[in-house]
Amino acid sequence: MSPYISPLFSITMIMSVMLISSSGHWVFMWLGLELGTLAFIPILVWWHSSLEVEATVKYFIVQAMAAAVFFLGGMVSLSGDFMGGVNQLMGNIGDMMIMLAVVTKLGLAPFHYWVVDVVQGLNYIPGAVLLTWQKVPGLAVLTQLATCNNSSMLLLFGMVSALVGGLGGLGQTQMRKLLAFSSISHLGWLVVGCVAGSLLGLSYFTLYVVLSIPLFSILHMLNGGHLNQLRTGLMFNPLMSVLLGVGFLSLGGLPPFFGFFGKWLLLTHFVGQLLLGVSVVLITGTLISLFYYLRVSYLCIVVLGPQQIMSGLNWRKMQLSGLMSGLLVLNMLGLFLVGGASCLPK
């Protein structure tokens, strides 16, 4: 792809989010979602491999079907304005169809199966964009829908996603699939945060992006698609091993790392609102997902291969950008942020 064209797609994706955020009408929401989808599709096939083409076709089919349901839901809701006594019923049906379409576009459970297959076929860079920035348009729509009567349904989708994301990643040895299930779990927390308040959702999303981008960048440099390949790539990179292991622990929300701060913010809000059931389900999903985070971190930090023990080979150095190093060091500041936030006046 020409370097002069790729910024155009990036700007278009940003404009799609601005269009959704600045309008409360379903037509402009639909236009914003589809504008972002069309701008993102060329990025998916950046390296032109057969797996990327297959993943792009799957992504396009799912997004097109969800877009059709979204548009149909908007028309059903609009038709209720002209049908007198059934106005409320038609409006509720239309809102439900719109919500299901957005949930499918985001990949929330139980409409999450396409996310795993698509991410598995992508390179790490477009996969990172899919699991981070491409969630913003859908989350912006859900934030506006949460002000209606759909908040309880969105809470249910969020809790189910947190559990499915934890359970689905338990037996995975493919790093891309593991990251996909991790994203589904975090997406559940994100949706619950959007229901609790747009500021909480934005805070959690920012933390997730800050934690995810360095991990995707390191995995892209190592080109490790399988846990065994990852171990081989890390064998002569001790600094990279520690940083990657700490990054996964932080992404799992384990104290005292940075990722714990985001979950602590949401849990304190729900406990304050006496939503203990939601808190228990989210914590359960996180504890389950911690199993595969710990497995990867153990592989990165603790396990030493026989070649490392028996041979005196020099360690191979891999350069890290200053920004990435700073973001990974930030992972260690979780408890300091929690302590500082606790001292703030209520």
From Swiss-Prot:
Top enzyme category = translocase
Q: Which GO terms describe its cellular component?
A: mitochondrial inner membrane; respiratory chain complex I
What's the main place this protein lives? Answer: mitochondrion
Q: Which InterPro entries match?
A: Complex_I_Subunit_2 (IPR050175), NADH_UbQ_OxRdtase_chain2 (IPR003917), ND/Mrp_TM (IPR001750)
Domain of life here? Answer: Eukaryota
Q: Which GO terms describe its biological process?
A: mitochondrial electron transport, NADH to ubiquinone
TM ranges: 1-21, 26-46, 60-80, 96-116, 122-142, 151-171, 178-198, 199-219, 242-262, 274-294, 320-340
Enumerate the UniProt keywords alphabetically.
Electron transport, Membrane, Mitochondrion, Mitochondrion inner membrane, NAD, Respiratory chain, Translocase, Transmembrane, Transmembrane helix, Transport, Ubiquinone
Q: Which reaction does it catalyse?
A: a ubiquinone + NADH + 5 H(+)(in) = a ubiquinol + NAD(+) + 4 H(+)(out)
The record's GO molecular-function terms, alphabetically, read: NADH dehydrogenase (ubiquinone) activity
Q: Where in the cell is it found?
A: Mitochondrion inner membrane
Pfam families associated with the record:
Proton_antipo_M
Disulfide-linked positions: none
What EC designation does it have? 7.1.1.2
Membrane topology type, per the record? Answer: Multi-pass membrane protein
State the family named in the UniProt similarity comment for this chain.
Belongs to the complex I subunit 2 family.
Q: What does this protein do?
A: Core subunit of the mitochondrial membrane respiratory chain NADH dehydrogenase (Complex I) that is believed to belong to the minimal assembly required for catalysis. Complex I functions in the transfer of electrons from NADH to the respiratory chain. The immediate electron acceptor for the enzyme is believed to be ubiquinone.
Indicate what this protein is called per its UniProt record.
NADH-ubiquinone oxidoreductase chain 2
